[in-house]
Amino acid sequence: ALDGLVFQSKVRAVGVSNFRPWDVELLQGSMQTRLVTNQIEVSLAAIQPFTNGDLAFHQRRRDPVMAWSPLGGGSLMTGHGPVAAELDALAAEFGVDRAAVAVAFLLRHPATILPVMGTNSLARIARIADAEKVRLDRVQWFRLYQAALGQEVP
């Protein structure tokens, strides 16, 4: 069915949502066209794809990953604790808000993570777009990552 959509020029390419690596491989094995993306939940509030192999799988395939809920359903904007403290510190350092730092964290990862933002507010979109101004170095990136993991990275 997905191949048919591409062959009939109804779509240029197809991807999937919430597939684990073995699901992508299983479906891909029965297709003639290439799956080009997988939309998964990944953020500083949903860190599992960094540790369970999902991002590594797509990075190896050179497939961009679409990140749904990249702001943790808003929890990263209103939450407290270690992640919020790191977001606030970096937001102050770069002169942006938490959302820009949270998105910059995803953009800095080499797996090519494409955040899917769920807002229609132009002001909110502008604040999120400030992620392009945030150039996290490795130390800053790992501070956020460790805060999200709740432990130091060896």
What are these regions (language model features)?
Residues A1-P154:
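Beta/alpha (TIM)-barrel catalytic core signal, keyed to glycine-rich beta->alpha loops juxtaposed to Asp/Glu
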